[in-house]
UniProtKB/Swiss-Prot annotation:
The name this protein goes by in its record: Zinc finger protein ZOP1
Single annotated GO MF: double-stranded RNA binding
Gene name linked to the record: ZOP1
Subunit structure as annotated in this protein's UniProt entry: Component of a pre-mRNA splicing complex. Interacts with STA1. Interacts with PRP31.
Database matches in InterPro entries: Matrin/U1-C_Znf_C2H2 (IPR000690), Matrin/U1-like-C_Znf_C2H2 (IPR003604), OCRE (IPR041591), U1-CZ_Znf_C2H2 (IPR013085), WBP4 (IPR040023), ZOP1_OCRE (IPR035622)
Keyword hit for Ribonucleoprotein: no
UniProt keyword Mitochondrion present: no
Superkingdom of origin: Eukaryota
Biological processes annotated in GO: gene silencing by siRNA-directed DNA methylation; mRNA splicing, via spliceosome; RNA splicing; seed germination
Entries under Pfam families matching the protein: OCRE, zf-U1
Origin species: Arabidopsis thaliana
Length: 242
């Protein structure tokens, strides 16, 4: 039988970072030693410092988050207040009535009940009875005065025919006819119209013709004669029997 010698392993100390003999006596002596106790105290001190630094960092981050949330809340509330002010400035006036309507053509709000116009940019009011832009108190005072005099605030549209008296429908049968009947009739003109036109042409004075116009008229007349001479044999072609 063959016997083998096996060496005894050592023990590693995590605090001192050294190897010691792996037996109870060596381990006890090492644990009771001054160096080991100092290393253990240092390790515990480092652990406490790291824990305190971690707690401090957590508290710092928590405080920073609270500041960010508070700043975001203030900014949000400020934005809401600004939006409400803008909506109030650009919206209809808050006078307890809901009769205001936005006129897209002019960009002003109009109240059909009292006839006032409101400009949301400046906050002024306009009325036909006043004739210029005024504040809210002056506008409603004018409306109250106008309502007391029983004068309509909204002007009635004036007809295009002017301010003359209205003409009623004439009695009897209504016959519609054109103002110029000759122009509406289609067809050949009458002999009377032809005679009048011919008389007008005869009464007109002859215009002076230049030499160039005379040459052009002469050339056109010669061309017309040539065309007539060329087409004379063809006249009556379709009247010949086959």
């Amino acid at each position: 039988m063959t016997e083998y010698w096996v060496s005894q392993g050592n023990k590693w100390c995590e605090f001192c970072k050294i190897w010691i003999q792996n037996n109870p006596t060596s381990i006890r002596n090492h644990d009771l030693g001054k160096r080991h106790r100092e290393c253990v105290d240092k390790k515990l001190t480092d652990m406490r410092e790291r824990s305190a630094a971690k707690d401090k960092e957590l508290k710092k981050n928590e405080k920073l988050l609270q500041q960010i949330e508070a700043k975001a809340t203030r900014s949000y509330q400020k934005d809401i207040a600004t939006a409400q002010q803008v909506a109030k400035a650009n919206g209809a006036p808050e006078d307890g009535t809901s009769d205001w309507m936005l006129d897209s053509a002019s960009g002003y709000y109009y109240n059909q009940t009292n006839g006032l116009h409101y400009d949301s940019q400046s906050g002024f009011y306009y009325s036909d009875s006043i004739g210029h832009w005024v504040t809210q108190d002056e506008a409603y005072a004018a409306v109250k005065t106008s309502s007391g005099t029983k004068v309509p605030l909204v002007k009635k549209p004036v007809s295009s025919s002017g301010a003359g008296p209205s003409v009623g429908k004439p009695p009897g049968r209504l016959v519609t006819a054109s103002l110029n009947p000759k122009r509406a009739v289609k067809g050949a003109a009458s002999s009377v119209d032809l005679g009048n036109n011919k008389r007008k042409r005869q009464d007109e004075k002859p215009k002076k013709v230049s030499a160039e116009e005379k040459a052009a008229l002469k050339a056109r007349e010669a061309a017309r004669k040539r065309v007539e001479d060329r087409e004379k044999p063809l006249l009556g072609l379709y009247n010949r029997p086959f």
